[in-house]
């Protein structure tokens, strides 16, 4: 059971990470930092994590080790996690490549103290890399709806892959992000079509 102090340099603005769901992500992106560690077991909700003291005054990235909003995640699990987080006076970052799932929970009380983020690593679709994730444009359309609803949004362009500038700028802009995070491939054992200049 753990509320982990954030140590990475990608999200320096986050104070902690918290992972009540663990295991294989449906999106199966080969560059995922979790895939490099070991063979992951099936996705599960760790009920013991719903007993962790989340403290107060923290900015917690919930679900940093798997996409807790993927299409195969049971709604009951998401509801349990949101309800639990809402019991603490913190701010939360929820990130997904499937932001359409966010739409089901926009009226949940925890959203009043949350930021919703999606990954838009390129405007292109690389099927062998992005696999089961929704298309970047689909993500941007949903994030536009979320921003119009009044919930703060972020976009993460990581790992940044080759893109078409005008189209990528359009997708990011559609999300009306308060912040854009940009990062490169951190899995040196995986070759991606990264920008060359």
Regions found by a protein language model. Name each.
Residues 1-61, 67:
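N-terminal [4Fe-4S]-dependent radical SAM core
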Residues 45-197:
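Conserved AdoMet/S-adenosylmethionine-binding subsite of the radical SAM
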